[in-house]
């Protein structure tokens, strides 16, 4: 069982096939990728295991910062998390996180890219909160 910080945060990179996941501690401003998931029961297990104080969801926006179909689906996902887990859910602009994740992980599996994108979303959240 992982050690729990009082303020552990889970972040999600929402996708239609997979959801990238990362865990982090704001006090240390560290984030680490976890295996990607694809179902709410898997998310429930992560929430029970890590007992986060809050959740973060990346919102995919266009280059211009406009919402589109995936933005609305990610927002729906964030609202489902709020309702189901009764935790605060922050939204973070995730433009370019998947591109940066692919750059960091050239040649690795797509599942790893999704969770590294979630790690980048969480790192951005920490930067914005500082």
Model-inferred region functions:
Residues 2-12, 16-130:
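Phosphate- and other anionic-substrate recognition elements at nucleic-acid/protein interfaces
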